[in-house]
Amino acid sequence: MGLELPLILGTSSVFRREQMERLGIAFQAASPDFDETPMLGESAPQTALRLAEGKARSLAGRFPEALIVGADQVAWCDGRQWGKPMNLANAQKMLMHLSGREIEFYSAVVLLNTVTGRMQRHIDKTVVVMRKLDELHILRYLEREPDAVYCSCALKSEALGALLIERIESTDPNALIGLPVFRLVDFLKNEGVDVL
């Protein structure tokens, strides 16, 4: 590869930063300035992809010669989108409602080359079947995993949240954490970045 462009991860998510760090690829994290409000009539995959693209594009002015990763995740259950509870009370209500249900997580990742304008896109669908939960189990989980309030559906699957799950169907287990790593590696290779 000729010119090596810096890799920018457009996120304020500590979980996505941790995923990138585990890959051992040099990158810089930057918080995108982008309105993440869902649009009326938008499907969960459409929302996830629009937000991932918007995050990447919002950083293009700050990083005019870079590869920018944008990612977002939207959960779908019972005919509606679910986000992050952001506090304990919301997390308890959310987990009680989702107990025993099937949730679809749509994790979008994009890679924007700000020099060429090329944007690669992918949406990964992960189906999660939750165990039947009672209030005591939910309280214990949230006491032991306080960061879960910052996860989609309060489900920190890479840690104790795994105990709440009965089954997962996915082509990329990383996607449920928030970043479809398998596809991102392909995107980076397409840009001439050797990840190993």
Curated annotation (Swiss-Prot):
It is an enzyme of class 3 (hydrolase). The keyword Heme does not apply. One of its GO terms (molecular function) is nucleoside triphosphate diphosphatase activity. Its cofactor is a divalent metal cation. It holds the Pfam family Maf. Its EC number is 3.6.1.-. It is found in: Cytoplasm. The keyword Transferase does not apply. Its main location: cytoplasm. It comes from the Bacteria. One of its GO terms (cellular component) is cytoplasm. It catalyses: N(7)-methyl-GTP + H2O = N(7)-methyl-GMP + diphosphate + H(+). Gene3D superfamilies: 3.90.950.10. Keywords: Cytoplasm, Hydrolase, Nucleotide metabolism. The active site is at 72 (proton acceptor). GO terms for biological process: nucleotide metabolic process. The record marks 15, 73, 158 as: Important for substrate specificity. PANTHER family: BIFUNCTIONAL DTTP/UTP PYROPHOSPHATASE/METHYLTRANSFERASE PROTEIN-RELATED (PTHR43213), BIFUNCTIONAL DTTP_UTP PYROPHOSPHATASE_METHYLTRANSFERASE PROTEIN-RELATED (PTHR43213:SF5). Belongs to the Maf family. YceF subfamily. Nucleoside triphosphate pyrophosphatase that hydrolyzes 7-methyl-GTP (m(7)GTP). May have a dual role in cell division arrest and in preventing the incorporation of modified nucleotides into cellular nucleic acids. This is 7-methyl-GTP pyrophosphatase. It comes from Neisseria meningitidis serogroup A / serotype 4A (strain DSM 15465 / Z2491).
